[in-house]
C-alpha cells in the first residue's frame, strides 16, 4: 500500500527565490543534517535543526524579508493496509501584503527513517 500526502495551496509566485531554488535549499539543508557526523539526530530534533538551517540560508539570500519556517513531522513507520489510518491538519494564517509577501509548502520524505516532513516557509517584506 502506498500512502500519498498532498500539499495544496501556497503563494510562491512572488518568492524572493525561484520555487526550484527553495526546493534545493530545503533539500540541501536536510542532506547536510544527515551527513553531519557531529549531530546526533536520535537526541536532537531534526525539525528544529532543519528550521535553523533553512532560515540561515534564506537570511543570507535576502535581508529584505522576514522569514518564518514551520516543519510538521509525520512518522509513517508501521503504517500498512490494516493500520493506515491517521489524520493531520495544520492551518496557518497571516496578515500581509499579497504583492510582496507569500508562502511556500513542500513535502520532504525520508524513506530510510520512515518520516515525512511537511515544510512551510513564509516571507514578509520588511
From Swiss-Prot:
Protein's UniProt keywords contain NADP: no
Sequence positions bearing N-acetylserine:
2
Q: Which residues cross the membrane?
A: none
Where in or outside the cell it occurs: the entry states:
Cytoplasm; Cell projection
InterPro entries from the UniProt entry: Tctex-1-like_sf
Please give the GO cellular component terms listed in this UniProt entry.
cell projection; cytoplasm
Q: Report whether Zinc-finger shows up as a keyword of the record.
A: no
Q: Give the record's keywords alphabetically.
A: Acetylation, Cell projection, Cytoplasm
CDD domains tied to this protein: DLC-like_TDA2 (cd21457)
Protein family membership: Belongs to the TDA2 family.
Q: What is this protein called?
A: Topoisomerase I damage affected protein 2
Origin species, per record, is: Saccharomyces cerevisiae (strain YJM789) (Baker's yeast)
- The gene name on file is TDA2
Amino acid at each position: 500500500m502506498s500512502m500519498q500526502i498532498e500539499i495544496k495551496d501556497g503563494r510562491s509566485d512572488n518568492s524572493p527565490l525561484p520555487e526550484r531554488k527553495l526546493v534545493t535549499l530545503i533539500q540541501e539543508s536536510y542532506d547536510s543534517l544527515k551527513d553531519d557526523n557531529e549531530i546526533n539526530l536520535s537526541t536532537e530534533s531534526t525539525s528544529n535543526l532543519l528550521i535553523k538551517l533553512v532560515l540561515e540560508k534564506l537570511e543570507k539570500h535576502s535581508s529584505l524579508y522576514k522569514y518564518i519556517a514551520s516543519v510538521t513531522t509525520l512518522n509513517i513507520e508501521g503504517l500498512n493496509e490494516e493500520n493506515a489510518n491517521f489524520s493531520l491538519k495544520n492551518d496557518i494564517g497571516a496578515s500581509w501584503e499579497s504583492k510582496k509577501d507569500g508562502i511556500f509548502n513542500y513535502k520532504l520524505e525520508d524513506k530510510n527513517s520512515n518520516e515525512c516532513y511537511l515544510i512551510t516557509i513564509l516571507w514578509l517584506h520588511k
